[in-house]
C-alpha cells in the first residue's frame, strides 16, 4: 500500500539571499588564458596530436582547467538542452562557464557550434567559449572567415575586443536564445592542428 504524504511547510533559511554565481571578467579571462595556453602547447607539438579527435582533445583541455579550478571542470556534462564538452561549476554548484570543442569544416560548422553552445546555457549563464580546431585548411582562411560568419549569425549582437592578445581569438556578445535582452559572452579560440599528410 502507498503511504500518504503529509504536506510540510518549507523551511526558511536564516541566511540572507545568495545570488547565482557569475563569472567576473577577470575569471573569464583566466579561463580563456588556460585554454589559450593549452591550445598553443598543442600547436607547438601538433605531431603528437594529429590523430586525436574532438573528444580526445577535450580531455587535454579539461586536464589543464582542473589544474586551475580543482574538481570544478568536467566534460560531457548535462546542462539545459544537452551535454556540453566543458563545464565549470562554482563551488556552490552553479554553472559559470561552458565550452564546446569543434573541428572547422566551414562556416556552417561554426554557426552550428554557436547554436549548440547556446543550447547548453540557461538564462543564468553568461560566459562561454568555442574551441575551434583547424585540421586541414590554411589557418588564414579560417581566421578570416570567423568574424564574417559570426556577424551573420541571427543571435549576434556585437563584436567585442578579445580578452586575449592573439589574432586567433575572438569575443562576441550574443543574444541568449530564450531572451534577446540577455547577453552572453562567447569567445572563439582557433588552433591549428593539421592531420598528418
Feature roles, as predicted:
Residues 103-154:
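Catalytic cores of nucleic-acid endonucleases
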Residues 135-197:
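Domain-level recognition of nuclease-like catalytic cores that cleave nucleotide substrates
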Residues 1-66, 70:
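The feature marks a conserved, polyanion-engaging helical scaffold used by nucleic-acid processing enzymes
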Residues 62, 67-93, 107-109, 175-180:
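Active-site metal-binding core of divalent-cation-utilizing nuclease and nuclease-like domains
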Residues 97-99, 129-131, 187-189:
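Hydrophobic/aromatic beta-strand patches that form the interior of the parallel beta-sheet core
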Residues 30, 52, 56, 60, ...:
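Short, well-structured alpha-helical interface segments that form or flank functional binding sites
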Residues 61, 86-88, 96-103, 120:
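Conserved catalytic cores of phosphodiester-cleaving nucleases, focusing on short active-site segments
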Residues 90-92, 102-105, 190-192:
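Short, flexible loop/turn elements at secondary-structure junctions
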Amino acid at each position: 500500500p502507498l503511504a500518504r504524504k503529509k504536506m510540510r511547510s518549507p523551511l526558511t533559511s536564516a541566511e540572507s539571499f545568495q545570488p547565482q554565481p557569475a563569472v567576473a571578467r577577470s575569471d573569464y579571462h583566466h579561463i580563456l588564458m588556460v585554454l589559450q595556453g593549452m591550445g598553443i602547447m598543442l600547436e607547438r607539438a601538433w605531431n603528437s596530436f594529429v590523430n586525436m579527435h574532438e573528444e580526445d582533445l577535450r580531455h587535454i583541455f579539461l586536464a589543464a582547467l582542473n589544474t586551475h579550478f580543482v574538481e570544478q571542470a568536467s566534460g560531457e556534462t548535462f546542462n539545459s538542452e544537452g551535454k556540453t564538452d566543458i563545464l565549470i561549476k562554482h563551488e556552490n554548484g552553479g554553472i559559470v562557464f561552458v565550452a564546446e570543442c569543434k573541428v572547422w569544416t566551414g562556416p556552417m560548422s561554426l554557426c552550428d557550434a554557436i547554436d549548440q553552445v547556446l543550447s547548453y546555457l540557461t538564462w543564468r549563464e553568461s560566459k562561454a567559449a568555442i574551441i575551434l580546431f583547424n585540421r586541414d585548411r590554411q589557418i588564414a582562411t579560417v581566421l578570416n572567415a570567423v568574424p564574417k560568419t559570426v556577424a551573420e549569425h541571427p543571435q549576434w549582437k556585437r563584436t567585442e575586443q578579445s580578452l586575449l592578445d592573439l589574432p586567433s581569438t575572438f569575443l562576441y556578445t550574443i543574444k541568449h536564445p530564450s531572451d534577446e535582452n540577455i547577453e552572453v559572452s562567447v569567445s572563439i579560440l582557433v588552433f591549428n592542428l593539421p592531420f598528418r599528410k
